[in-house]
Amino acid sequence: MKIVFIGTVDFSYQALKALIINGFDIVGVITKKKSDFNADFCDLTPLTEKYHIPTLFRKKDNEEEIISFLKEKNPDVIYCFGWSQILPAEILSIPKFGVVGFHPAELPNNRGRHPLIWAIFLGLKRTASTFFIMDEGADTGDIISQEIVTIEESDTAATLYKKITEVAVKQMIYFSKEFELKGENIKKIKQDITAGNSWRKRGKIDGQIDFRMSSEAIYNLVRALTHPYIGAHLVLSDEKEVKIWKVIKKSCTFANSEPGKVLDIEGNKILVKTYNGAIQIVEHEFLELPKKGQYL
């Protein structure tokens, strides 16, 4: 079975490496030299050069070159993991068994953008690692493999990413063997897209901490946006922004204090009143610590 692999993030690297180690025939790779779009961008060329895999780099206007490359390689299946662009119909029609996409959510729920960030911010207790046959929609194709992944209260974007990657790589090896045995007759489950939802693109404002939020909401926001992502932030009275990387929920006896009031300073840690309790800011980028009694 001939596979062309498309991807440009850390999961792409782990998946490609696993396919190579398990002896699958990777006849070509399409990737990017650099991406400012993906916080988890990963260079695949150490693998492609080591194993002498023909590689084409995505550029701004080389779609025709990509199509020619794919037709020349004549793959049975294309794996497209960690790619921001929706593939056109012409590419989807090239491989015999279709193009396999990946989405770290429990499809048909939670299609769309930033699935790990939204899942953590919303306080979900579970998500999923889902592979599907791509169509012209966004995350709407027939599902070929789905495994539930538990989200712990202590999980951050980084730890959840790692958990899902470990699960997803095992899934991929299993269904790749199924493809070799069954080809296009591999089991597929059609999505009921009317029953699901789609998450929107996040904006900068979505990462802003407002202490009128609950302690739980602030805690979830910070752990959703911590490394390798952009980080949650505060906007101070002088319009300066401060990145916040880690917070701890704290009980609060200051019921009459307003949200945003600095209740205590302990070393480099800042205790701040929230709507329903308090948050201790543990890791941050304050150039100068606020004073007790100040408002953030």
Name each model feature, range by range.
Residues 1-231, 240, 264-280, 286-287, ...:
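One-carbon transfer enzymes
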Residues 249-268:
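A conserved acidic, glycine/proline-rich C-terminal tail/linker
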Residues 232-249:
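Short, structured protein-protein interaction patches enriched in aromatics and acidic/basic residues
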Residues 245-252, 283-289:
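A short, sequence-level motif marking secondary-structure junctions
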Residues 143, 255-257, 292:
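Short, charged, solvent-exposed linker or helix-capping segments at domain edges/interfaces
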